[in-house]
Each structure stands twice: as C-alpha cells, then as structure tokens.
C-alpha cells in the first residue's frame, strides 16, 4: 500500500504528492487519510486527475475540515467498494457503504463490490416488453412503465416528484413484493428521514435498501452516491437474478454535483456552465441501469427541471435515455389535481397495441384526443363562454373535465396530510372506468364526484353521498 502526503487542500479538492519512484494510484482509486492521525476520523478521497511529478488531484467524499498539509495519505489500491446482498435490505448507507441508521454496525467481512463497473455487454441484455402495474391511474393508462425500463419524473420545485416516488415504492412493495433500492442524491435530509420512518412503520423497509448523499454533503459524495445505489441494485440483478426497482431522487443533483466537481478541477465549462463531460457521465450511469438475461433493474428517476425549462442541458441529456416520461405540471397542482401528471405531455414507448392490448390502447388514445380538443376549446370558452359551443362540444367538454378529475387519486403515503385513505387501482379497472366515461355512462354524475377517488365504483359511491 503506497503512501503520499497532502500537498494542498482547496475545499473538497485535495492534492496528494507521492515520492518519486512510488507507484502512483490509478484513476478512481480510493485513498484514505486520517485527520490528525486519529483512526476514528477517516476521510476517503477519490483520484480524479494525475498531474505529473508524483502529484494526483482527488475529490473528498467527506468534509475536509481538519485536513492539513503534510498528513499521510494511504492508497487502498482499489475503487470505493460498498456492501451488497440481502443484508443490505432494511438498512441505510452513505456513499461509502457505511451504515448510518444507528442499527447494528455492518459486518466487516460482508461482501463488497466496487462502485465503478462497466455496463453489461450487448449479448447479456434482455429486451422483454412487460408492463409494470403501478396502481396509479394516470400512469397506468397514458404512460405505462416497462419492467426493466427507465422512467423520468420531470417537474419543477414543489410539484410532487418525491411524493410520487414514495407512492410507487409503497405500491410496488405492497402489491408486487419486489426489492427496491432508494438512492437520495443531493435532496433534503428531512425528506430522507421522513421516508425512512414511513417505510419502517409500513414494513416496506424490509424489502428496501436506502443510500443517501444529501444536500449538505460535499459534491464528490453527491456525484458518486448514485453509483453506490446502482451497485447494490446490480448485485440483486446479476447474482440473485431478481427484478429490482431503483429509485433515484434526484438525477439533476447528480449532474449538479458533477458540474461543481468539474469547476473545482478547473475544466472549461460548456453550455449554461455545465461540465463538458455531462453526456459521458450521464451515459456511464444510465447504461448500467438495464435488464439482462438474469434479471432486471427498472429505474424511476425524479428529474428537477430548473425554472421549468425543459431545454436546460441537464434534463435534456437525461431525456435521451428514458423509455417513459411522467411530466408533472404546476397548473394542475393549482387546480388541486394530484398527482399533477400532465396527461398530454407524458409519454411511453410501451403505449402500443402490441404491449398493452387493443382496448387499453384505444381508450388511452381517445382520452388523449378528448383532452387535446378540450385544451383547444378553452380559449373559446374563456372569451365567449360555454354558450357559443355546439351541443357536441359541450358534451365533449363535460366528459373531458370528468376525465381530468378522474385522473387524480389519493395516495397512501399522503394519508397523514390529507386524512383520506389512498387507493391502488388495477389496470383493468382503470381502463374500464375511462371507457365508461368516454361512452357517456356517467354524464349525469357531478364533476366533483370524480375528484380524488380510486375506481369508477368510488365515483358512484361519492355521488350518492352528495345526493345528486
């Protein structure tokens, strides 16, 4: 194990000099330094540049407070490695794979794997087309998720990305019993804490491994924590042969951390100040999130859209890798429609007759047609009023409004805030409900009865309570 000494510390960037003749650490190797020689105060550094003359530049995974020039640095000879396997379920880790949940310390001899790996080769990949039922009507009907696919949840600040992710974890664990890996990348510590305790109370935590690198962490930790979560998920796929759900909240923070690191390393910025290696870094992460012949990793990624600008390079780069997009719209939150999924902007390559079936496809496309026509008529209604519409258009507007409200539903994870029990709606029931609305079977039921309910039976029951 070769050793060097700290030459300079600039925030999270640490330069380490090795004696001439010593073997230099390789790129991505983990180096260890102890603050003031105290073994309990370990800081892990990752090699990012070799500057020549025995000097390497590293990024710290933890705070560099207390590091001084001249401290001894040890080369571990390998990349950062994290625990994998069934023992990770129910536990919470940081970027280095250290347990941070105050439970029993993780076994020293536990199996570990490096966070830097190559993506599976072409001949290992699987191309199945099976739908993953979420129990959320608007998603299952209009932008269904593929098992083993990549899903992006796009939205600005405060439109409900994290709540939607929490509901998906809840539904998939309760209804499918699947294993989930939740990766918190640069988000609020409070949200991570709330999620952990909610999952513990509901028992979902037993099927979930959680990895956090939150907002207060150095950029190196926020950039690498997504790889830590992915490594845990890959083990379940490749060794255990399981179908795994990988939740990443938020993939934008991964890009943001990469941008900070890039600037600290002195690289020339590209468009909007992002790192020149943006597409490469995103590709290296996304290409590892895939399905093989052994198992699948279905990833659901929350993607913050800065200032609601979808042309920003960070969300635009993520778009290229996705099978389904779920776009959250602020106007819908203002109307009190949750989840605030835009039914016309959201899309999925799974919405074809070959994958979802003819009836589902026909109902979904008709729902989109009705909503699109309603959107076109809204300008006329705003200027001239409903009276100027033909009878046919008035009927269409009534059905469109019922559809719009029926796309909302209460969430199980939001029950503590709303006081309303959440609902899980199977796909067949969702398709049947919307087909009945399109056929005009419920034209007499007041629009308010369709708001924040589960299946069509719930609408009828709510209408009876309203004494319509």
From Swiss-Prot:
Return the EC number.
7.1.2.2
**Keyword tRNA processing part of the UniProt annotation:** no
State any single GO MF term.
Answer: ATP hydrolysis activity
Asked if the record carries the keyword Ion transport, the reply is yes
Q: Indicate which residues the UniProt annotation says bind ATP.
A: 155-162
Its catalytic activity?
ATP + H2O + 4 H(+)(in) = ADP + phosphate + 5 H(+)(out)
State the SUPFAM superfamilies in the record: C-terminal domain of alpha and beta subunits of F1 ATP synthase, N-terminal domain of alpha and beta subunits of F1 ATP synthase, P-loop containing nucleoside triphosphate hydrolases
Entries under SMART domains matching the protein: AAA
UniProt record similarity statement:
Belongs to the ATPase alpha/beta chains family.
Q: Tell me, how does this one assemble?
A: F-type ATPases have 2 components, CF(1) - the catalytic core - and CF(0) - the membrane proton channel. CF(1) has five subunits: alpha(3), beta(3), gamma(1), delta(1), epsilon(1). CF(0) has three main subunits: a(1), b(2) and c(9-12). The alpha and beta chains form an alternating ring which encloses part of the gamma chain. CF(1) is attached to CF(0) by a central stalk formed by the gamma and epsilon chains, while a peripheral stalk is formed by the delta and b chains.
Identification of the protein by name:
ATP synthase subunit beta
* Organism of derivation: Streptococcus agalactiae serotype III (strain NEM316)
Q: What does the organism's lineage look like at the top?
A: Bacteria, Bacillati, Bacillota, Bacilli, Lactobacillales
């Amino acid at each position: 194990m070769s050793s060097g000494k700290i030459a300079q510390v600039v925030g999270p960037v640490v330069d380490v000099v090795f004696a001439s003749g010593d073997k230099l650490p390789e790129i991505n190797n983990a180096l260890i330094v102890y603050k003031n020689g105290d073994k309990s105060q370990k800081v892990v550094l990752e090699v990012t540049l070799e500057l020549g003359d025995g000097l390497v530049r590293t990024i710290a995974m933890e705070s560099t407070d207390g590091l001084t020039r001249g401290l001894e640095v040890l080369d571990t000879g390998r990349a950062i490695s994290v625990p994998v396997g069934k023992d990770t379920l129910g536990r919470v880790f940081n970027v280095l794979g250290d347990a941070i949940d105050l439970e029993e310390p993780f076994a020293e001899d536990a199996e570990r794997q490096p966070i830097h790996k190559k993506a599976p080769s072409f001949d290992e990949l699987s191309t199945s087309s099976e739908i993953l039922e979420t129990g959320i009507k608007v998603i299952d009907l209009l932008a269904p998720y593929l098992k083993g696919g990549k899903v992006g949840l796009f939205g600005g600040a405060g439109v409900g990305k994290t709540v939607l992710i929490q509901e998906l974890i809840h539904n998939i664990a309760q209804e499918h019993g699947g294993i989930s890996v939740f990766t918190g990348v640069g988000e609020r510590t409070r949200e991570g804490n709330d999620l952990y305790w909610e999952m513990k109370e509901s028992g979902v935590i037993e099927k979930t491994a959680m990895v956090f690198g939150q907002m207060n962490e150095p950029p190196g930790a926020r950039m690498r924590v997504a790889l830590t979560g992915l490594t845990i998920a890959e083990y379940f796929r490749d060794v255990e042969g399981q179908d795994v759900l990988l939740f990443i909240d938020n993939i934008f923070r991964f890009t943001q951390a990469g941008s900070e690191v890039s600037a600290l390393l002195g690289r020339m910025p590209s468009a909007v100040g992002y790192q020149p290696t943006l597409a490469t870094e995103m590709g290296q992460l996304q290409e590892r999130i895939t399905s093989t012949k052994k198992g699948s990793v279905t990833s659901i990624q929350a993607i913050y859209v800065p200032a609601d600008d979808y042309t920003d390079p960070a969300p635009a780069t993520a778009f290229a890798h996705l099978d389904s997009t779920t776009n959250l719209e602020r106007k819908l939150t203002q109307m009190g429609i949750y989840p605030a999924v835009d039914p016309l902007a959201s899309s999925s390559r799974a919405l074809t007759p070959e994958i979802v079936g003819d009836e589902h496809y026909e109902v979904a496309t008709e729902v989109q047609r009705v909503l699109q026509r309603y959107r076109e008529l809204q300008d006329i209604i705003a200027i001239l009023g409903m009276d100027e519409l033909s009878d046919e258009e008035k009927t269409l507007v009534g059905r469109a409004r019922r559809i719009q409200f029926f796309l909302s539903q209460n969430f199980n994870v939001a029950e503590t805030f709303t006081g309303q029990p959440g609902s899980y709606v199977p796909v067949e029931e969702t398709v049947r409900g919307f087909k009945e609305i399109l056929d005009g079977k419920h034209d007499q039921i007041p629009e308010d009865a369709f708001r924040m309910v589960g299946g069509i039976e719930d609408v009828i029951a709510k209408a009876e309570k309203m004494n319509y």
